[in-house]
Amino acid sequence: WSNSEHNGRVVAAPVQGGSQNTRIYATVTEVEGTKTLGLASAEWYYHRNITDSKGVEYTVTETEMPQSKITITGDRNEDQTIDWQDGAIAFRDIMNNPYKYEEVPELVAWRIAMNFGGQAQNPFLTTLDNVKRVAMHTDGLGQSILLKGYGNEGHDSGHPDYADIGQRMGGAEDMNMLMEKGAEYGARFGIHVNASEMYPEAKAFSEEMVRRVNGNLSYGWNWIDQGIGIDGLYDLAMGMRESRFDELKELVGDNMDFIYVDVWGNLTSSNSEDSWETRKLSKMITDNGWRMTTEWGSGNEYDSTFQHWATDLTYGGYTSKGENSEVMRFLRNHQKDSWVGDYPSYGGVANSPLLGGYNMKDFEGWQGRNDYDAYIVNLYTHNLMTKFLQHYQVVDWEDGAPVQMT
């Protein structure tokens, strides 16, 4: 194991944002008919020199001191065979664990509460009523609510002013009441933020924050105002992003559980949004006591505990539904909602009836979904089983022969 933040040399992925973080290199050589395997840590960054989009250079200090660990093991799962599964079980003793990963098996009832376009469709105290409603129908099973549009005039307004909690939705007072009272019903709350794009109404918007590509603006999403690319390296090196998260922390204290970082990895804020930048972003979030979650199915493998495109099975392209590595799922099925779910019509690894995978639905406006009954039925049909199994670590994996039902 290594904590290298390097992107690796040959790894392919559909997006950046930490998806290419290669921490160990394996090299196979053959000499006089004898093959040998060597393992080595990838490069570490200590004091990294970076240049923002306007040509200004900075030196950014290390995220943490370089580390590598080795473990040697025997038949850990007692199946009379020593193979990669025994190595994976032993690897858990030395690997990194995403912050607050132990919460994941308890989060049975994920959903999005949506506010958009200044309409405050789901004020914070209405969301609290819905928390109580779901708690009654699930005997208090854990809930995880993503407040998409908590700030400014709602979703994709006012980025990246993280502390601009929307007044129409109830302001900081009602948001804290939602989180404090909701916790009594087993609910945890997080917010949707953006570290790549900003909007002209944001207080953080400035010429220094704008990313320039050959002198031109970098553009993002544009369904209300036109999103303008943030100069992510400037934002990082100058401590601007970190200070905005700190301002939010002053308002919400310890009430909030997680942060969802939208679109990170689509290269709006820099030419790379690489694993090092991603680890820096994650540390700003986890240092404030917030769990890290993100959008893309393969994004931020090191720190993220939830990938929206992996769990919202009918949203986004079917080829981008999450991590499909058998080894990764063996290691971390209990730590993440980041896997290709059980959705057989997609084919391939999406046919996963044993471990399942989170199947996200909503009833508070996201994607126009408003069917509460369907939400509850889906929890019991798909997600209760998935979450039950996440309480246990995988120790023995056997691929059976497929059966064709006739």
Residue ranges and their predicted role:
Residues 200, 204-243, 290-406:
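Glycan-recognition surfaces
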Residues 178-182, 281-290:
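Alpha-helix-loop-beta-strand connector modules within alpha/beta enzyme cores
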Residues 264-265, 282-284, 296:
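Exposed, low-structure sequence patches enriched in small/polar residues
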Residues 1-144, 149, 167, 185-188:
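Carbohydrate-recognition beta-sandwich/jelly-roll modules
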Residues 274-280:
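Charged helix-capping and loop-helix junction motifs
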Residues 269-272:
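Short, contiguous acidic/charged loop-to-helix segments that flank catalytic cores in large enzymes
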